[in-house]
């Protein structure tokens, strides 16, 4: 299960980050950085004035959900329509803001992860010190995680009967 959770985090692009501040729950979708070489760490970035990053920088607990939708499953029976997906839920705690060199390293790794093959100075301008100083990155140490997935075709009672009325199958939504 930890290998599956790590694989889902490595494949995902958007995390939904949930936290409670002053009794009010929040969920914020965010790009994130995850590297299987440091499997219990996840990184978030944003404005130094960000409510979320400021709150988590004080060590607050957070829940993170990442879901990848792989396909729409249609059935000849309404009850058996479904979605193929991979998901992971993590429970973690925030830590203080990373220093400038750590922030630079995480931001470079994020660009490489989201935009493979791009290089600073060739494909985009090198980040200036003021750009790095204007961005907060915090590390989250994952305490617990669990993965869940649904794979496969429809499982309705008549889905394997080609002469039954209606249609059944999977619309593949996975990105190459």
Question: Positions of the model-derived regions?
Answer:
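A generic structural signal for nonpolar/aromatic side chains embedded in well-ordered alpha-helices
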Residues: 9, 55-56, 110, 140
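Short beta-strand segments
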Residues: 11-48, 64, 74-80
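Short gly/pro-enriched beta-turn/loop segments at secondary-structure junctions
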Residues: 12, 83, 132-135
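A structural signal for short, well-ordered beta-strand segments
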Residues: 32, 92-94, 138, 142
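Short, structured beta-strand-loop surface elements
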Residues: 48-109
């Amino acid at each position: 299960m930890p290998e599956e959770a790590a694989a889902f985090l490595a494949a995902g692009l958007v995390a939904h980050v949930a936290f409670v501040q002053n009794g009010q729950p929040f969920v914020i979708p965010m790009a994130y950085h995850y590297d299987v070489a440091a499997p219990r760490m996840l990184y978030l970035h944003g404005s130094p004035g960000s409510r979320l990053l400021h709150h988590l920088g004080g060590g607050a607990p957070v829940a993170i959900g990442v879901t990848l939708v792989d396909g729409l499953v249609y059935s000849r029976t309404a009850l058996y329509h479904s979605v193929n997906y991979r998901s992971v839920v993590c429970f973690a705690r925030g830590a203080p803001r990373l220093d400038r060199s750590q922030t630079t390293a995480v931001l470079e790794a994020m660009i490489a992860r989201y935009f493979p093959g791009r290089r600073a100075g060739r494909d985009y301008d090198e980040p200036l010190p003021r750009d790095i100083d204007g961005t907060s990155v915090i590390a989250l140490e994952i305490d617990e995680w669990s993965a869940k997935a649904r794979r496969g075709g429809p499982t309705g009672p008549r889905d394997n009967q080609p002469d039954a009325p209606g249609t059944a199958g999977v619309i593949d939504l996975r990105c190459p």
